[in-house]
Structures are given as structure tokens and as C-alpha cells.
UniProtKB/Swiss-Prot annotation:
Source species: Clostridium kluyveri (strain ATCC 8527 / DSM 555 / NBRC 12016 / NCIMB 10680 / K1)
EC numbers: 4.1.1.65
Subunit structure of this chain's protein: Heterodimer of a large membrane-associated beta subunit and a small pyruvoyl-containing alpha subunit.
PANTHER family in the record: PHOSPHATIDYLSERINE DECARBOXYLASE (PTHR10067), PHOSPHATIDYLSERINE DECARBOXYLASE PROENZYME 2 (PTHR10067:SF17)
Subcellular location: Cell membrane
Described purpose of this protein according to its UniProt entry: Catalyzes the formation of phosphatidylethanolamine (PtdEtn) from phosphatidylserine (PtdSer).
Top-level EC class: lyase
Name this polypeptide is given: Phosphatidylserine decarboxylase proenzyme
Length: 296
């Protein structure tokens, strides 16, 4: 059971997990763990499933998925009948007016829809994956000089489950450098997996870039793939100026995670988010929603 805090209702809710029985069997049973290490975490498994999700045969899975998880398709540009395959549906784009982006330059917004956890004054060698598991920023990006810049800074972890909108966005005006790609495995990033496998973010396929923002300093963006994520697609142009809320990229099928690192004394996270994170709960947020302010 995964419990998260709904910021709008001020209530705790139970997450409806896609493939929950499969996840529990895979990550909590001896046979499942053996199969995970032999096949499921491998690129070939996710690649084959990606081929299926890109095929016309996968289209029949779209409507039941929408119905089972009560997805509001009024938020999106394309409607159900227009998708050619499941990956078209999974990487669906929002209508311009379906998310309210706070344009105040002092306001820090969420880069996407998902479940958010935040950590301040981070120890670069003990960043929290989930209670009881930590990892090193150097091992995450394989660049010690870049990692040092975020000592005592702030870390935001936005987990996107398969039912979420899977495009991610820039949180400010600025310029983003080119993307570094790191090969890796394809473990799930669901809390069921995070509680049973150490260093998942450092083991999985991932990409990172430095975003030179106008109001919040240099920000390290890290996109982490997961089981059945066919690819991480970057849609921005390195070196080109972007606006707050512009799309940076998207994930193809699977749950996935966006991690943002801020330098020390650049942002202040809203109190409610810190409180929930300190208690071990994720908070549901939407792209463009205010999650903090500029440090002053």
C-alpha cells in the first residue's frame, strides 16, 4: 500500500498502482527477484515491451487503462480514438490551458505531474532514495566537480507513475546545456521497488543536464528511466533560451522519475511539502504548481 498526501484535499490517499500484484511478486519474492536480475532489469526486456507499445496492437489497451485509472482526457490535446499506439497515449501532450503555471518570477513551480519529495541541506553522499536507503550524487551523474556545486543544496524528487502525464518542463526562464546520457538497468521506481533495491537511481538508465536559470541559479536536471521505459526523449535545444513552463522532454512507457538539485541558498520549499517529506510521505503536485519561492 502506497499512501501519499493530496495537497488540494489535505487528505492522505492510497495510490492505485498499475500492475501492483506483479510489482509485489517481482520485488518481494525470491523467485521474482531472481527473474528481475536475470531478465526484467535488462534493456532487452524494456526494449521488447517498447516495441509492443509502439505497435498498433497495443492500441486496444488504451481505453481500459483510461477507464481503470479514471484519467481525465479533457486535459489533453488528442482524444482516445486518435492515438495510433499505447506510447502515443502515454506521451500525450496537455492542452495549453489545462495546467495553471504561476508566472511570478519568484515562484518555483513543479516540472511535471507526480508525487513529490523534497530534501534540504543535502549530504552529497547520503541523498535519500527512500527511508533506509541513500545514494551519492557523484554516483548518480559520474561527475564529481558538478556534484560538489550542490553541497548543502536542495533536492526535489518527482515520481511519475504510469497513470501520470509524462512530459517534463523547465521551471524558469534560462538556457539548458546539452544532455549527458548514462547507460543502466531498468528497475521500477515505484516505492515497492525502492524499498527493496538499493541505489536504484544510480543503477538505472538516466540523463542529466545543467539548466542556467534566471532566478534560481544553476539547476541540475536528472531524468531516470524505469522498467519498460523505451526511451527518454529530450525535445529542447541546448543553448537556446527557454521560458518558464516550456517542455524539456518526455518519457515513453513506464513509471519514471525527475530529480532536480539546487545550489545552497537559492530556493525555499513550501512548508507543507517539507513537513510531508519529513514524515516520509510524497505529495501529489501538478506541472506549473507553486512548490517554493526564490531565496531572499
Amino acid at each position: 500500500m502506497i499512501k501519499y498526501f493530496n495537497r488540494k484535499t489535505k487528505q492522505y490517499e492510497i495510490e492505485q498502482v498499475a500492475g501492483e500484484k506483479y510489482l509485489k511478486w517481482t520485488y518481494c519474492s525470491p523467485i521474482g527477484m531472481k527473474l528481475l536480475e536475470l531478465i526484467i532489469k535488462k534493456k532487452i526486456f524494456s526494449k521488447l515491451y517498447g516495441y509492443f507499445c509502439n505497435s498498433r496492437y497495443s492500441k486496444k489497451n488504451i481505453y481500459p487503462f483510461i477507464k481503470n485509472f479514471n484519467i481525465n482526457m479533457d486535459d489533453y490535446i488528442e482524444q482516445t480514438d486518435n492515438f495510433k499506439c499505447f506510447n502515443d497515449f502515454f506521451s500525450r501532450a496537455l492542452k495549453n490551458n489545462s495546467r495553471s503555471i504561476d508566472r511570478d518570477e519568484k515562484v518555483l513551480i513543479s516540472p511535471g505531474d507526480g508525487r513529490l519529495q523534497v530534501y534540504e541541506n543535502i549530504d552529497l553522499n547520503k541523498i535519500v532514495q527512500i527511508k533506509g536507503f541513500t545514494y551519492s550524487l557523484y554516483n548518480l551523474i559520474n561527475d564529481i566537480e558538478i556534484a560538489k556545486r550542490f553541497y548543502k543544496g536542495t533536492c526535489l524528487i518527482l515520481r511519475l507513475c504510469p497513470t501520470d502525464y509524462h512530459r517534463f518542463h523547465f521551471i524558469d526562464y534560462g538556457i539548458c546545456d546539452f544532455t549527458h546520457k548514462i547507460k543502466g538497468n531498468y528497475y521500477s521506481v515505484n516505492p515497492i521497488a525502492l524499498r527493496n533495491i538499493s541505489n536504484i537511481f544510480c543503477r538505472n538508465k538516466r540523463e542529466w543536464s545543467i539548466f542556467h536559470s534566471k532566478n534560481f541559479g544553476d539547476i541540475l536536471y536528472v531524468e531516470v528511466g524505469a522498467t519498460c521505459v523505451g526511451s527518454i526523449v529530450q525535445t529542447y535545444f541546448p543553448g537556446k533560451h527557454v521560458s518558464k513552463g516550456d517542455e524539456k522532454g518526455y518519457f515513453k512507457f513506464g513509471g519514471s522519475t525527475i530529480i532536480l538539485f539546487f545550489e545552497q541558498n537559492k530556493i525555499r520549499i513550501h512548508k507543507d511539502l517539507l513537513e510531508q517529506s519529513n514524515m516520509g510521505y510524497e505529495t501529489k503536485v501538478l506541472m506549473g504548481e507553486s512548490i517554493g519561492i526564490k531565496y531572499q
